[in-house]
Amino acid sequence: MSIQNLVVNGGFENGALPPWVGQNATVTTQFSHSGFWSARLLGGAVTSFIAQFVPVDAGEGLEFLVSLAKEGFPAPSPQVQIQVSYFDSSFNFLGQGLFLNIPFNRLPIVENNTWLEVYQTTTPAPAGSTMAFILINTLPQAGTANVIVDDVALLDVEGGGTGPTGPTGPTGPTGPTGATGPTGATGPTGATGPTGATGPTGATGPTGATGPTGATG
């Protein structure tokens, strides 16, 4: 099984945003979830975002990961939205793979080295999909803190083919004999068999008594 991260520069270790595009977004070494760099989305009464197109195949279900935190205290974090959308090769919208809303003031404080680690599974890419559009944005609200973003990943997990069938295991021991079942009904009488051979002649019996003398002529 192989795991491929479709996002390029997801940890911002290039020291710049590209190939991400963004608005009110910069990179910084002041904070990081891993490595040295992260992205900062400006808080307050402005909309800030980073976005990137990545290649996908139709039918793929992907795993999305990102680490988020807010910068500074006591300012609350703004509402944050995360979207993964599917497009064809002509940039026609085909469907939503993921929409996640993180409510107002739900992000931990980055200065405490605490992060909200997001892990979500997308719906499979519909037929005709060639690209996924990843968008991470804040919603404008005065007085809210900057948002720190790091370790963005969209993982394609590819499983290997089915291996050959293993050898048959040994035969298990014979189980105990079950209880004797009930006697079945008496079957029908069979046909009369053929007559047997004539037996041997018996022994001669004893001579009978002498009969009476007849009358004188």
Model-derived segments and spans:
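Short acidic, gly/pro-rich beta-turn/loop elements at beta-sheet edges
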Residues: W20-G22, F49, P74-P78, N92-L94, ...
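Extracellular polysaccharide-targeting segments
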Residues: M1-G15, T114, T122-T130, L135-G172
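Extracellular beta-rich ligand/substrate-recognition surface
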Residues: W37-S48, V110-E111
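Extracellular glycan-recognition surfaces and repeat-rich motifs
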Residues: S2-L42
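Extracellular carbohydrate recognition and processing domains
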Residues: F93-G128
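Collagen/collagen-like triple-helix recognition
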Residues: V157-G217
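Extra-cytoplasmic beta-strand recognition segments
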Residues: F12, V46-D88, V118-T122, A132-I134, ...
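Cysteine-dense, low-complexity repeat segments
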Residues: M1-I3, G11, V27-F31, G72, ...
